[in-house]
UniProtKB/Swiss-Prot annotation:
Protein keywords: Developmental protein, DNA-binding, Nucleus, Transcription, Transcription regulation
Upper taxonomic lineage: Eukaryota, Metazoa, Chordata, Cephalochordata, Leptocardii
Main location: nucleus
Subcellular location: Nucleus
Protein name from the UniProt record: T-box transcription factor T homolog 2
PANTHER family, alphabetized: T-BOX PROTEIN-RELATED (PTHR11267), T-RELATED PROTEIN (PTHR11267:SF106)
């Protein structure tokens, strides 16, 4: 006779129930005379008891660690049982943590109605409870009244002891309490935060969830420290030039190969201006820095004039013979040196003359290394004394030069002149003529 699909499903379910009952039947006793309940993970509980165990209570509820587990034997495999959990006060003290230890700190608060936690597998056969340890891993401890079915309300800084109740249900005697079991190793003090650092370390060591949380926290702390160090490095590099003088020159040394060899420029750049470089380094780089004088100018190696862009630095400069332009064709010739700054208008002991006189000395002029586009009149003579500078005017001259008076060296602050003023003559544009560079 073949079984119908409905009969096959029913027999499959019944076989599953029979296998479930038989799983814990070997530990069962229909008479319940040898009922035995033992604490699971007893050595771990003993470690926490030696440090005075603490359990966190919060408004939303916090689970216990270590988790309360018991091993049960001696139940009727075919009877139905429920497992309940509640907490009772272990003493009549309120506790406080002083100098690294827990001491009684006064009278306890009035006791609240005891809350009972019912194991979610209840009710169930005795065989179900005996086949594996009964774990109360989902119970939560709270300091708020009426927290819910899975939460137990406890007073902070009070010592409690868990109690496990086994109730037989569904029998002819209806519901009756079979037994209650307590374990001294499971006593703890309810706290809102751990007080003992050794206890905290022990919980982190044995709690896999707390260890994972700690590892994540350590990774975040390590990453945060690494980001701070990375952010500080560019800050230190920017501030280094600000707080430490001389960390960067104002003018770095130029490339010695970027100038023509005929100019004879030294490669030291601005190294000799150490007083300017070490005065104060800017915290931010200047948008434009000139590392060397223009290629069209000669560089006087003996001159000591600072290369400053403002004209105010010219007022206090001493006048010496070795800093001025000299011409080999002039009567008063000294050692030829290059001028550090261009001279657009040549001032000499002679009067201003047309360009024909300048062309006569062109060969001497080109020996100085100055380009021809900056030569306007005669080549300058050595400045033994500053001559009188006169600007000629004519009747048709510009109002700027009309009725102009001669500017003596006395008015300009350079001393007295030994040369009498020359007659005023108008310099016309026809007197200017381009010069060609001689073959080198």
């Amino acid at each position: 006779m073949k079984q119908t699909p409905d009969q096959f499903s029913v027999s499959h379910l019944l076989s599953a129930v029979e296998s479930e009952i038989s799983a814990g039947s070997e530990k069962g006793d229909p008479t319940e005379r040898d009922l035995k309940v033992t604490l699971g993970e007893k050595p771990l509980w003993e470690k926490f008891k030696s440090l005075t165990n603490e359990m966190i209570v919060t408004k939303s509820g916090r689970r216990m660690f270590p988790v309360l587990k018991v091993n049960v034997s001696g139940l009727d495999p075919n009877a139905m049982y429920s497992f309940l959990l509640d907490f009772t006060a272990a003493d009549n003290h309120r506790w406080k943590y002083v100098n690294g230890e827990w001491v009684p700190g006064g009278k306890p608060e009035p006791s609240v109605p005891s809350c009972v936690y019912i194991h979610p597998d209840s009710p169930n056969f005795g065989a179900h409870w005996m086949k594996s340890p009964v774990s109360f891993s989902k119970v939560k401890l709270t300091n708020k009244l009426n927290g819910g079915g899975q939460q137990i309300m406890l007073n902070s800084l009070h010592k409690y002891e868990p109690r496990i109740h086994i109730v037989k249900v569904g029998g002819p005697d209806n519901q009756r309490t079979l037994s209650t079991h307590t374990f001294a190793e499971t006593q703890f003090i309810a706290v809102t935060a751990y007080q003992n650092e050794e206890l905290t370390a022990l919980k982190i060591k044995h709690n896999p969830f707390a260890k994972a949380f700690l590892d994540a926290k350590e990774r975040n702390d390590t990453k945060s420290g690494h980001d701070d160090l990375t952010d500080q490095q560019p800050q230190f590099s920017q501030l280094g030039g600000w707080f430490l003088p001389g960390t960067g020159p104002i003018c770095p040394p130029p490339n010695p190969h970027q100038f023509a060899p005929s100019l004879g420029l030294p490669s030291h750049g601005c190294d000799r201006y150490s007083t300017l470089r070490n005065h104060r380094s800017a915290p931010y780089p200047h948008p434009y820095q000139r590392s060397s004088p223009p290629t069209n100018y000669g560089h006087d190696t003996a001159a000591s004039l600072p290369m400053m862009p403002t004209h105010d630095n010219w007022s206090g400069l001493p006048v010496s013979t070795h800093n001025m332009l000299s011409m080999s064709a002039m009567p008063h010739t000294t050692t030829s040196t290059h001028a550090q700054y261009p001279n657009l208008w040549s001032v000499s002991n002679n009067n201003l003359t047309p360009t024909t006189h300048a062309q006569t000395h062109m060969s001497g002029t080109m020996g100085t290394g100055l380009p021809h586009q900056f030569l306007r009149t005669t080549a300058p003579a050595p400045y033994h004394s500053i001559p009188t500078c006169t600007v000629p005017t004519t009747a048709s001259s510009s109002p700027v030069y009309h009725d102009s008076h001669e500017v003596s060296s006395t008015d300009s602050g350079y001393g007295h002149s030994t040369t009498p003023p020359a007659p005023q003559t108008r310099i016309t544009s026809n007197n200017w003529s381009p010069m060609t560079m001689p073959s080198m």
